[in-house]
Regions:
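Acidic, glycine/proline-rich low-complexity segments that act as flexible tails and inter-domain linkers
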Residues: 1-48, 101-122
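Amphipathic alpha-helical segments within well-ordered protein domains
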Residues: 35-36, 53, 70-74, 88
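Iron-sulfur (Fe-S) cluster-binding segments and ferredoxin-like electron-carrier domains
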Residues: 29, 68-82, 106
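Alpha-helix C-capping/helix-to-loop hinge sites
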Residues: 37-41, 55, 90-93
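Alpha-helical scaffolds flanking conserved acidic
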Residues: 46-51, 80-86
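C-terminal structural segments of small proteins and small subunits
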Residues: 84-109
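Short, thiol/selenol-centered motifs that function as redox-active sites or metal-ligating centers
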Residues: 52, 56-68
C-alpha cells in the first residue's frame, strides 16, 4: 500500500502552482525559465538530472518535488536501483552534514567554559 496517492498529489501540486501563477505570474515564469535553462545543459542527461532532483527533494523534505521528479525520472528511464543509489548519496551527505555540525556543537560547548553565560551575555 502506498503512503500517498502520488499521481493525484502531483496533479494537486500542478493545480496549486497554476493558482500561484495567476497571483504572481512573474515568479512562476522565472522558476519555469530557470528550470528550462537547466534542462538545456548537456553535461548530464535527463535521467541523471531527475535523480539529482530527487536527492535534493528528500533532503528538503519536499513531497511535491518527490511526486513531480519521480514521474520525470521514470519517464527518463531511471531504475529502482539507480533511484536507491541516488537517494543513498543524499542520505549519506545529510548524515555527514549532521556529523560536521556536531563538531560545531562541541566547539560551542567548550567555548562557553565551565559555566554557560547568562542570557544576553556573550
Amino acid at each position: 500500500m502506498s503512503m500517498l496517492d502520488w499521481n493525484t498529489y502531483r496533479k494537486q501540486v500542478a493545480a496549486g502552482v497554476g493558482e500561484i501563477s495567476k497571483l504572481s505570474p512573474d515568479t512562476v515564469r522565472g522558476y519555469a525559465q530557470l528550470s528550462a535553462a537547466n534542462a538545456k545543459t548537456t553535461h548530464f542527461d535527463a535521467k541523471i538530472r531527475e535523480l539529482m532532483a530527487l536527492a535534493v527533494a528528500i533532503s528538503l523534505r519536499c513531497d511535491g518535488c518527490i511526486a513531480v521528479h519521480t514521474a520525470e525520472a521514470k519517464k527518463a528511464g531511471a531504475t529502482e536501483g539507480e533511484l536507491a543509489e541516488a537517494l543513498g548519496v543524499a542520505i549519506s551527505v545529510n548524515a555527514g552534514a549532521a556529523l560536521v555540525y556536531a563538531t560545531r556543537t562541541f566547539d560551542s560547548f567548550k567555548a562557553m567554559g565551565e559555566k554557560a553565560p547568562e542570557a544576553g551575555q556573550s
